[in-house]
Amino acid sequence: TIIHLSCLVFIMGATSIPYWPNKRPFYEQPLYLFQIISPSAIKKYGIINYWIYQYVSLQPVSENSKQYIHKFMKQYYKRKKSLSNNHHNKNLILILVESLQSWAINLKIEGQEVTPYMNEIIKDSTTLYFPKIVPQVKDGRSSDAQLIINTGLLPLMTGAASSLCATNTFPSLPSALKEKGYTSISFICDNRTFWNQGHTTIAYGFNHLYDQMQKEKERKEADETLFQNALPLLKKENSPFYAQLVTLSSHEPYNTPIIVDSPLMRKKFINNEARNYLIAIQYVDRCVKHFIERLKKEGLYENSIIIITGDHEQMTFNNYEGRVQQTVEDCFVPFIIINSPLKSKNTNCYFSQVDIYTSLLDLMGCDSYFWKGLGESVFNNDVSNYATFRANVAVKGEETPDSIRNYKNECWRVSDILLRMNYFKEPH
């Protein structure tokens, strides 16, 4: 019996190595943990591996943690103020671009612009551009970005919330907009089982999910097909609506260029992967241009606020420059607001990805919604100018009080517990 038990412990230890909490440096990519639903994970990885993963990732929330959360949330509701009095019924169209990073915008390679269209629109007086958004995704990668932007929560410290918390009750942007009469729809290129989006889309309060929007096209043509197929569906949708479009074409790997006749093919680069990444971003820029031009032609543009943002870092700026050492600044993603009804004096400040949710509530006039998120609005008069990349890794302005730094870092633990205990299932 002792021998059998010892063997079992050894096997469990050996097979569980990929599932231990991520201890790697912040500049390395998090582990990709189970981006599929439970039955598929069991079939692919085996019941023992999946059980270990569940066990490690979803330890029961202790009574001390529950008391800590109740105390935190009590103070949270006292501290969070109503948002600006900004009332309108404009549509919200959010384009979540795969791996789009700020350093690629306004970049010229030997005189050749990488993103000529985005370069043009960020100069418009009705457009706001925040280039210093710190991505906060962890093991869930793209699915974590949807969680952060749509719920104002941070990811699990270990594991993908899309797999482990898909049956949770979430406060969300779609739910806030529903109170104002909005319908929320999401368009994705992948199958709905990928990152468990079929379940999380419902959990986040969306009314409809349109998946496999790339149809039978290859990845390099996915975004063009996504926008083409989404447009007639948007035309049929009654206003006001919130539409989330999740792109795919700029996904890794960057082994080969998706456009072989791109002008960037004739330019000099330190490495080919950086070149191929920028070629993919150049293609996305063109697709976004055509989509927005069609919105104008179909009469949807003027009555819509359009958001362009990246889901996470991938080809970071240091790789483009040939530097080994990576900083948080190398990982910034953009936050672009087209047709913004609000102004902001904070466009050059540091913000966290979780701040996008709070800012969108502000932008859409959801001032009465109970959950303002764990972030701060880019439209606030005073902002912290402090953003966390991973827990305890941050960028900051000249002066950051300890109270702000402590609160921002505390939010990682808070969100992890909120998710694991399904806090919002019961009214508080």
Where are these regions (language model features)?
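Solvent-exposed soluble domains appended to multi-pass membrane proteins
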Residues: 71-428
